[in-house]
Amino acid sequence: MTSATAAYRAARDDLLGLRGQQVRAIDEFRWPDVGEQFNWAIDWFDAIARGNNRTALVIEEDGSSTERSFDEMARRSDQVATWLTAHGVAKGDAVLVMLGNQVELWEAMLAIMKLGAVIMPTSTAAGPGDLADRIARGNAGYVLCGPADVPKFADVTGEYIRLAVGAVDGWADLHDAYDLPAERAAHPGTAPGDTLLLYFTSGTTSKPKLVEHTHASYPIGHLSTMYWLGVRPGDVHLNISSPGWAKHAWSCFFAPWIAEATVFLYNYSRFDASALLAQLREREVSSFCAPPTVWRMLIKADLSGGPGALREVVSAGEPLNPEVIEQVRRHWGVTIRDGYGQTETTAQVGNCPDEPVKPGSMGRPLPGVPVVLLDPVTGARAGAGGEGEICLDLSRHPLPLMTGYQGDSQRNDEAMAGGYYHTGDVAALDDEGYLTYIGRTDDVFKASDYKISPFELESVLIEHPAVAEAAVVPAPDPIRLAIPKAYIALAPGREPSEQTAFEILKYAREHLAPYQRVRRVEFFELPKTISGKIRRVELRAQENARRASGTAAEHEYDAE
């Protein structure tokens, strides 16, 4: 066992031992000193995996399953690392990884990490335009995807090497890796501060930001996420999340394997609450994490005869309504615990296991995460009973924080202004240290647990010849919490009609990823400030008031 492994294990075990003692954990926990060299895939995963035949990964789909032990994952990721090396992947190279929930995704992530290369996770929902932008801005020298997504790269230019999980003309086949000797690839050595991950995350007025994480910020920082989840050694952990997004790495990769738990994935083409409940029972899932959209769908199913092994249930991404929490508690005898974090960080705030849960609250700051609330105008710290922007105190060196937005000094200056990292989210603080989420300081919103940037959707909408201006806001929805609705100012000579709405919605559907789908349009003169900026806050308020009163707009049309 290396000194880095020993330090990491000691920190992990400290948090496991402080279960149900969050206040004490906040006071006592210290991030491990792993020294000048640290690689989580080698110093942690391989250390717990070699000779370990317990199940590390289970993927269930269409009645069949694929399983890998910890030892198999260690050996197979070595084979993939050797194969990647043969194709030129070296320390510092960026690899765009666009795979679904399949074993090769986990093996590739471990392998890329072992080589000191950079993982650029990408959703399979991304289209050619998104891919071209990511390859260019992320300086990706390699692309790894499944055969079904290969056609998306046909017109994506760039000097990148094409790698596929399967036989495709002109692309190297990753399956060839498994014919290679299971020997450890040469490890170049990685420092904790070396770049490990590049995530694209949406902003309000520009293209997605490029978030840079290191071999410390996520691999070590997710110790706090493990503490919030409550996952333990030997658990079976299921997280509902799509690959390519940070939450997938949080809860399908780092946190459960930090705890030495089994990662269980359930793939489905269409959500079926009854089928998911059956999997929870059959697989004896003990720890379950799902976005509010899934929880709202689950309570519409028969919750009787709940999963007997289920101990931890958590939700993240957006506030969860109390009725959902109450129904699950009544039927299953467990309480859904909320948490909060960002792509830019690990989990920051959470209701932790064996701690009192306050309805509507997302909990207290997690161990090692220096959360403060600052007044957005004055910058003063908010005390009990106050509210402010959720920030991290940079003077306390928050380890789980990104290095910054790569190649964007202006955004970095804004995000790190005044000695604090600014999340852009506002919360209220009570006298026991619990935080309750209020909303965003900007216009980004979530729909079905996907972060939506109005700017990205509006940029596509205004390409349509009938659209002069567009403003996208969240429209309340009982299942998805919100759906993207577009307020449209029509071009001269165009009249509001069902046919025009259909054409615009069709165009948007063809040019946006499925999760970005605009589901409603209204033809409306956009309210603006004196300087000409669209007042989305006014549109949001109007939307909420209409839905609350059940009032329909004259020129509103649905995509359904």
Task: Label the predicted regions.
Residues 62, 142, 148-192, 207, ...:
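ANL superfamily adenylate-forming
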Residues 365-368, 380-414, 452:
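Conserved ATP/PPi-binding loop(s) of AMP-dependent carboxylate-activating enzymes
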Residues 258, 285-289, 299-358, 370:
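Gly/Ser/Thr-rich phosphate-binding loop
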Residues 66-71, 196-220:
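Conserved AMP-binding A3 loop
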Residues 53-55, 169, 179-200, 206-207, ...:
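Conserved pre-ATP/AMP-binding loop-to-beta segment of ANL
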Residues 512-534, 552-560:
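AMP-binding/adenylate-forming catalytic domain of the ANL superfamily
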Residues 126-127, 143-146, 288, 411, ...:
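AMP-binding/adenylate-forming catalytic core of the ANL superfamily
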Residues 219-236, 244-286, 301:
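Conserved AMP-binding/adenylation subdomain of ANL enzymes
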